[in-house]
């Protein structure tokens, strides 16, 4: 559901650029519905934890902790590994993109950690 939401918002942006405002509106309204579905899934998953990190979720404090864990994984493991693979396969431009994203994810982790620290 989350993936569909992001895809449809991307498709809506493309439709806007191409002048298909009515099509863009269909994509956006459907994306909003997909968001509702994803939120419903997450409400059920509060009992078992964040599917992305395994961390408890539900309260703002727990949600921030899960966000820090997720973003930290992305900047320390996921994107660096993807960048290495891309570079090894000769996709230097994509590797550079992944390295840029790793820096952004590090910033996100820091923002979430700061918010968590300010809660306590």
Which residues does each predicted region cover?
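Non-heme di-metal
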Residues: 2-120
